A protein has these predicted regions:
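Signature of extracytoplasmic/envelope-associated structural regions
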Residues: 1-142
Length: 142
């Protein structure tokens, strides 16, 4: 069976309010975990547990290089803390969505906290932002 090698080059757009910012060039790692809450639907007479899908679950972890300024990583993340209205638009490679490059739109995510200063002598300052909650849609239409 043939395999495909995938070189990641994710696009990461963060929208808060009416402002969308492309932070792809400020990140070096991104993980999206999607799912649904399992709701037990076991009934009398069943011989094992049964489940049905409940509310969607979303967890996103992004590692950013810290930068400071009016429209930079620190200011953008600070504006997202605690609001629960952030929209993340992420695709694995490039901006054109296709079956081989699905775009995930994560709506009403919350950034509960982040570390605005994370400095070590001789190293690039990075921060991991963890967004949770909201809903997700997978888009493959160009």
């Amino acid at each position: 069976m043939a395999t495909t090698t995938f070189l990641s080059n994710a696009t990461i757009n963060i929208t808060q309010g009416a402002t969308t910012t492309d932070l792809s060039d400020q990140a070096n790692a991104c993980t999206i975990t999607i799912g649904v809450d399992p709701l037990e639907s076991t009934a009398f007479g069943d011989t094992g547990h049964r489940f049905t899908g409940g509310l969607q679950t979303v967890d996103v972890a992004i590692t950013f290089f810290l930068s400071y300024g009016a429209a930079e990583v620190e200011a953008i993340l600070a504006s997202c803390v605690g609001l629960g209205t952030t929209i993340l638009t992420i695709s694995p490679s490039g901006t054109s969505e296709t079956a081989t490059n699905p775009e995930y739109v994560l709506t009403n995510c919350m950034l509960a906290n982040f570390t605005p200063i994370n400095s070590t002598v001789g190293e690039l300052a990075t921060v991991e932002a963890s967004f949770t909650g909201g809903t997700w849609v997978r888009d493959v239409t160009p």
